[in-house]
Amino acid sequence: MIDPGHGGQDPGAINSLGLQEKKITLKIGIKLKNLLQNSDLFYPVLTRNDDSYVSLKKRRDFLKNNHVSFLISIHADSSKKRYVSGASIWITTNDRMHREINNFIKNREENIYFPKNIQNLIQKNKHDFFLKKTVLDLQFNNFQKMEINLSRYIFQQLKKIIKLDKINLNYASLGILSSINTPSMLIETGFITNFLEEKKLRTNKYQNKIANAIYIALKNYFQDRLLSNLRNT
């Protein structure tokens, strides 16, 4: 799933020239979806495909109730220091995810989609807090490994076209990254408050480059993963 950040009444970051983050994220998100549609590996879906407002709750509810193999949230960064520039990648913190898992178990939610094997374990052990927590902790560990490995592929492609603001993966307690049934990451595609990056981010050519870099990384990662799984069977 591709999540173009912000939208509608929520413009996201706005620079001194009036460029709104929501417009950049939507354009890159649509371009990425179009690229992914050309591959049999993917079935891409957008959280929004126009300038509409989609609340964080609605985005999270969709993830809860549907099978989403991976979520990529597209954003553009901002800073009061106009010289700051570059792309970065973020995933959720351990503390935030463990809190989400504990809340799920405590509230006994039943409307969350899980893979069949995990769903069966949870259903059979409804009242076993420790077993459910162990299963979900293990799933989170697997998700985190996937996020870390995929981030390496994306960094490899992004650094060909843009300076990296942070050369390592970053962690943040963000709601969009904290669904317990979906691996996810947030990509900051550059700073709209930086004159040079803002100038590039406005253009179709540069938006295409960003979308293509993410697409190539996703294709390479999932192809390698598929080949690895085939070798191990």
Swiss-Prot record:
Major subcellular site: secreted
Top EC class for this record: hydrolase
CDD domains membership: MurNAc-LAA
Reaction(s) this enzyme catalyzes, per UniProt: Hydrolyzes the link between N-acetylmuramoyl residues and L-amino acid residues in certain cell-wall glycopeptides
UniProt KW keywords: Cell wall biogenesis/degradation, Hydrolase, Secreted
GO molecular function: N-acetylmuramoyl-L-alanine amidase activity
Domain MurNAc-LAA residues, every copy: 1-219
InterPro entries: MurNAc-LAA_cat, N-acetylmuramoyl_amidase_3
Gene Ontology annotations of biological process type: cell wall organization; peptidoglycan catabolic process
Keyword Mitochondrion found: no
EC number: 3.5.1.28
Record localization: Secreted
Function field: Cell-wall hydrolase involved in septum cleavage during cell division.
Name the record gives this protein: Putative N-acetylmuramoyl-L-alanine amidase
Organism field: Buchnera aphidicola subsp. Schizaphis graminum (strain Sg)
